[in-house]
Amino acid sequence: MMMFGKISRQLFSLKKIPWSCDSRYFWEWLNTVFNKVDYERIKDVGPDRAASEWLLRCGAKVRYCGHQKWLQDYNKLPGGSVDRYKIQAIDATDSCIMDIGFDHLVGLEHVERITLCRCHYIEDNCLQRLSQLENLRKSLLELEIIACGNVTDNGVIALRHFKNLKYLFLSDLPGIKDKEYLAEVFTKALPSLELKLNLK
């Protein structure tokens, strides 16, 4: 609730809101506000709580270590100790997450699975940024990228840096032009990876 209050204040403090622009520009601008990283908040509540708030605010779901249920309702975020709930899985299907929010993931140490499905703001630079996160490089085991139209071969190739990755599913990615080359890159970089391609 406190986070939404802060966002509301940011919205109302702006001198000029782009109402005159088309709605697509407005929504992109609003999604940028939702993705903005509040480093003080991360310090106050810890990386897992702050990342949970960001992901749920953007329409994604999280699952915590030791829990079977996914959490999607921002108002049902658990309270208590900052060390109690650790994100184990992220499902960003139909969410508005974008690269400027990825600093929320820096302190996460237990994320084993990520699904990026129909994420309109996921581009090559997002995947490159993901592959630079040291903690994620160690913990991530499964990754699915589905129907993210702005992803190309360049972004996917960066995923070879996830040395512990066991499963990678790529589907409905029209920006990928050379799936044979991708398969070759991953076979060489990650020989134990189960790579599933559903690409044209």
UniProtKB/Swiss-Prot annotation:
Protein's name according to its UniProt entry: ATP synthase subunit s, mitochondrial
Family statement: Belongs to the ATP synthase subunit s family.
CC per GO annotation: cytoplasm; mitochondrial inner membrane; proton-transporting ATP synthase complex
InterPro entries reported in the protein's UniProt record: LRR_dom_sf
Residues the entry annotates as binding Mg(2+): 59, 93
One GO biological process term: ATP biosynthetic process
Subunit structure of this chain's protein: Homotetramer. Associates with ATP synthase.
Record region (N-terminal domain): 1-61
Keywords: ATP synthesis, CF(0), Hydrogen ion transport, Ion transport, Leucine-rich repeat, Magnesium, Membrane, Metal-binding, Mitochondrion, Mitochondrion inner membrane, Repeat, Transit peptide, Transport
Predominant place of localization: mitochondrion
GO molecular-function terms, A-Z: metal ion binding
